[in-house]
């Protein structure tokens, strides 16, 4: 019987990471939990985010996952190291992979970071980037409206274009040549963000680099699955199963997927 890779996020954003993992590792089985009922995590304090992240983690660990991907930047910043220390399975977040991808892309060492308020205030990206390259200059920008645009399914709409233009205006006057999408919801807005920032700015979706790290870690721990056993992906949400399914079907191209509603916490 296949063991799944577990993915957790505050909502549908982590599906952007799942998509990249399934591209690179098509034999792997995915269990995904989106805490849509309590989304967004960005404005919440670190202790509350850590508590919610542990609740999601325990739910998937109880279902026998072989690895955990914290596919949420805010949750990664709040709880990655604590969870990694206490679990006996491999655990990765999305901040280090995103930072590495940005440093590969930049030509002038001037990098912008778009994130939730929680991620920006944590200074997790500047810390990670400067830990890898001390010469890098980082401009961080909180974009609190982006998550609600994605969660409402409006990420291809005129509303999305307006919100992106208004939110990113401060970055247009900087000399950055690379932007990290420092929230896993934001890649659903990537075409609009790329169009607004222009051809001279590389827009980094940390999902690809995270997927490469997932592959490397599974290989290192001898957990890669190359068998042709039947794959049963499972998707869980604390919010509306229909809204989750509509976005997930569009993003993952899984027309027959089912989504299970669960409750977390009290």
From Swiss-Prot:
Cite a single GO BP annotation: cell wall organization
Record-listed substrate binding positions: 9-10, 41-42, 73-74, 184-185
For whether the record's keyword set contains Isomerase, the answer is: yes
Looking up InterPro entries in the UniProt record yields: Asp/Glu/hydantoin_racemase, Asp/Glu_race, Asp/Glu_racemase_AS_1, Asp/Glu_racemase_AS_2, Glu_race
- Regions that span the bilayer: none
Q: Which Pfam families match?
A: Asp_Glu_race (PF01177)
Give the EC number(s) under which this enzyme is classified: 5.1.1.3
Describe the reaction catalysed, as an equation: L-glutamate = D-glutamate
What does the UniProt keyword field contain? Answer: Cell shape, Cell wall biogenesis/degradation, Isomerase, Peptidoglycan synthesis
Q: Which GO terms describe its molecular function?
A: glutamate racemase activity
What metabolic or biological pathway is this protein involved in? Cell wall biogenesis; peptidoglycan biosynthesis
Location of the active site = 72 (proton donor/acceptor), 183 (proton donor/acceptor)
Q: Which family does it belong to?
A: Belongs to the aspartate/glutamate racemases family.
What function is annotated for this protein? Answer: Provides the (R)-glutamate required for cell wall biosynthesis.
Name listed for the protein in its UniProt record: Glutamate racemase
Protein species of origin = Listeria monocytogenes serovar 1/2a (strain ATCC BAA-679 / EGD-e)
From the broadest rank down, the organism's phylogenetic lineage runs: Bacteria, Bacillati, Bacillota, Bacilli, Bacillales
């Amino acid at each position: 019987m296949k063991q799944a890779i577990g993915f957790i996020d505050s909502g549908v954003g982590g599906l952007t990471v799942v998509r990249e993992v399934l591209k690179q590792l098509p034999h792997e089985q995915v269990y995904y939990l989106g805490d849509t009922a309590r989304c967004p995590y960005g404005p919440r304090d670190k202790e509350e985010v850590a508590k919610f992240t542990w609740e999601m983690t325990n739910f998937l660990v109880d279902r026998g996952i072989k690895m955990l991907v914290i596919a949420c930047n805010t949750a990664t910043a709040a709880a990655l190291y604590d969870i990694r220390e206490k679990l006996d399975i491999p655990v990765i977040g999305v901040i280090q992979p995103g930072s590495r991808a940005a440093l590969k892309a930049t030509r002038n060492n001037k990098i912008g970071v778009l994130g939730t308020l929680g991620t920006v205030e944590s200074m997790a990206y500047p810390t990670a980037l400067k830990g890898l390259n001390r010469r890098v200059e980082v401009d961080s920008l909180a974009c609190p409206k982006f998550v609600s645009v994605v969660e409402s399914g409006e990420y291809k709409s005129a509303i999305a274009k307006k919100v992106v233009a208004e939110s990113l205006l401060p970055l247009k006057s900087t000399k950055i040549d690379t932007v990290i999408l420092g929230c896993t919801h934001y890649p659903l807005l990537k075409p609009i963000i790329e169009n607004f920032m222009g051809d001279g700015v590389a827009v980094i979706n940390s999902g690809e680099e995270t997927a490469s790290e997932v592959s490397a870690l599974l290989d290192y721990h001898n957990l890669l699955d190359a068998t042709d056993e039947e794959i049963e992906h499972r998707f869980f949400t604390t919010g509306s199963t229909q809204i989750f399914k509509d976005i997930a079907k569009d993003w993952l191209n899984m027309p027959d997927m089912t989504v299970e509603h669960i409750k977390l916490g009290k």
